[in-house]
A protein has these predicted regions:
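Catalytic-loop of the protein kinase fold
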Residues: 159, 163-180
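Activation segment signature within eukaryotic-like protein kinase domains
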Residues: 151-152
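Protein kinase glycine-rich loop
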Residues: 31-37
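AlphaC helix of the protein kinase catalytic domain
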Residues: 132-143
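Conserved N-lobe loop of protein kinases adjacent to the ATP-binding glycine-rich P-loop
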Residues: 46-53, 60-65
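Activation-segment/catalytic-loop signature of the eukaryotic protein kinase fold
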Residues: 112-113
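AlphaC helix of the eukaryotic protein kinase fold
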Residues: 70-100
């Protein structure tokens, strides 16, 4: 068990995810894949320079690519090259736009964006949080307005600021909204 981030290799890694302890940029150590979606994987990771846990987002749309023999690189499936390249460019552009918005506490801060292994990654602050879906389920399936209001007002303010800056967030859902340990 990692004393810095709580990572444990006991549970095994998700299929097609990067192997445990893969090193990226000779700096970031890959831990467990916390989730996957149509865009790729989200891992718990460790920044060996700053000695802090981080969250690593890997662009790896499994409908367009697969792991190469080295178990690290993305290999684009035949006929999917244009779609992969367009989506990769969109991932990088959106990540750069979000990284420029640093003054909003309701948005996870992006520390680094890079390309490696024929794909791209973002590195952001690690937050020990739960999804809104889990929070609501744990609360009996409902939230009263006096409970929901302090959770959603920062989100609405952040969305307003993002849209004013020309940045869209197209993936808002109970799975992507997260509640921190302090209840924010």
């Amino acid at each position: 068990m990692c004393p810095h981030c709580g990572f444990s290799a006991d549970g095994g890694q998700q299929p097609n995810a990067l192997p445990f302890r893969t090193r990226l940029q000779n700096r970031y150590l890959v831990g467990a894949a916390k989730k996957s979606n149509g865009e790729g994987f989200v891992y718990i990771g460790y920044d060996a320079v700053l000695n802090i846990p981080v969250e690593l987002h890997e662009f790896f749309p499994q409908s367009l690519c697969e792991r190469a023999e080295d178990q690290k690189s993305a290999r684009v499936m035949g006929g999917s090259e244009i779609a992969f390249d367009e989506n990769l460019a969109a991932f990088l552009n959106h990540s750069r736009e979000v990284a420029r918005i640093r003054e909003l506490s309701a948005i996870v801060q992006i520390y680094d964006i890079f390309e490696e292994n024929h794909t791209a990654y973002t590195v952001s602050e690690w937050d020990d949080s739960i999804t809104l879906r889990y929070f609501v389920e744990r609360s009996g399936g409902n939230l009263e307005w006096n409970e929901a209001r302090p959770l959603f007002m920062p989100v609405l303010s952040a969305l307003s600021a993002m849209h004013s800056a020309g940045v869209s967030h197209l993936g808002i859902s109970p799975e992507t909204l997260r509640i921190m340990k302090d209840g924010k």
